[in-house]
Amino acid sequence: MYTDTIVAISTPIGEGAIGIVRLSGPEAFEIVDQLFKPFVKGNQKNKQLVYGHIVSGENVVDEVMVVKMAAPHTYTRENIVEINCHGGIIPLREILNLALNNGARLAERGEFTQRAFLNGRIDLTQAESVMDLISAKTKKGYDLALNQLEGYLSKRIKNLRNKLMTLMAQIEVSIDYPEEDIEEITYQQIHDDLLAIETDISVLLKNAQNGKIIREGLKTAIVGKPNVGKSSLMNALLKDSKAIVTEIAGTTRDLIEEFMNIGGIPIKLIDTAGIRDTEDIVEKIGVERSKNVFNEADLVIFMLNAAEPLTEEDLQIMSLVKDRHAVVLINKTDLESQIDENLINETLHDKKIIKTSMELEIGIGEVEKAIQEMVLNNEIVTSESEIVSNTRHIHLLETAYKNVCDAKKAVIDHLPYDFIEVDIKDGILNLGMITGESVEKDLLNNIFSNFCLGK
């Protein structure tokens, strides 16, 4: 348990109806008792909201509602106080400073949740899901984070880890007590147990890409040569004028990123600079960034200008698009067509090709539908509670999967039990790092530093 008491503003800084200053630690009640004067005298009950004033000496700082929550049945398993004041920056900072002057310490980023983890109320996957819950951009992302906060994924990971630990214990008995009258575990039994665990991990990894998209968004790059309508498409999809649209080629010189929601899936839409050879230094940097985004994108929207013949730049981009998940738009179909559609169909025969006109708003709905269909063929679901979505979890799960596969290979090769045990121990370690049962302090600090203050 901690010996110090922390304090932070838990609501966004700015103007609002209500702001919250939160304290947690052994002296939380005593510190607030020095600041809070209730309108009705008497002992404040646990989890009772009480009306009164925060005061500094004889001066009233703000009119507030205060709730005290006694350990261990709190978010951090420590005494917690939440002061509900007016939401302006002045009252919030005044109350924060009073708490600091009376013995509290300013909380680090994510320290309330870190204390909840270190005090055993939640494990590391649940702690990380708190930030996912706050930053969720769609209902599916929110539901996924909520399931993980409830501990569904944790139970699945812990169950896998316990199976490996049980198997390792059986192997160790066979190694350490060969002379005892104990039935020795066989290679076949070890193989069967490892195969079952391998299958369980592979099921989790199968859904991991879906989970990552739900959590982080489908990175979708709009690419094409300059002035084909990329910025117009982005504005049409967002139903807002985020990107500058002009007749001048090369207007977009930097990446423009915005999130949109299609069928409950967060789409990270990226309007790129037109890809072409240029002597303009600033535009050249934008083109290089566009190429990098193209390489990293989950989905590419490739735009062509129907009113012009195919250029060398079009053909160059087309050759890159062939091997990618892509939707092809032949834009400006309101103008007389000069483009070679036969060549496009031959080269990109396996791609969805849509004719559009940003000017007349033709084909926008079809583009949205195509994106939704491209999102893993509509296979993204959140009905399964144990979907893995966090990149850190996925990496550790992949490593644990390799550990189990290596152990199974050692069994097939009839290597000594000591060799098999090494890989099983590594698998236990990696699964434990997901839930926080085996994790280093530096990693914990790195994880919680990504949280907001007051959480």
What is each PLM-predicted segment?
Residues L269, M303, L329:
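Generic enzyme active-site microenvironment
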Residues G87, L237, T272, L304-A307:
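Glycine-rich, N-terminal phosphate-binding loop of Rossmann-like dinucleotide-binding domains
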Residues M1-D143, N147, G151, V327:
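A glycine-rich (often HGG/GG-containing) alpha/beta subdomain
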Residues R105, P266-K268, K352:
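Conserved beta-strand segments of alpha/beta enzyme cores
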Residues Y2-I9, I13, K37, G52, ...:
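C-terminal-of-GTPase-core extension/linker across diverse P-loop GTPases
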Residues E283-A307:
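Inter-motif core of Ras-like GTPase G domains
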Residues G14-E15, G57-V61, H73-E78, G110, ...:
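Short flexible coil/turn linkers enriched for glycine and charged/polar residues
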Residues Y51-D62, V66-A70, T251-T278, E296-L299:
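Switch I (G2) and immediately adjacent beta-strands of P-loop GTPase domains
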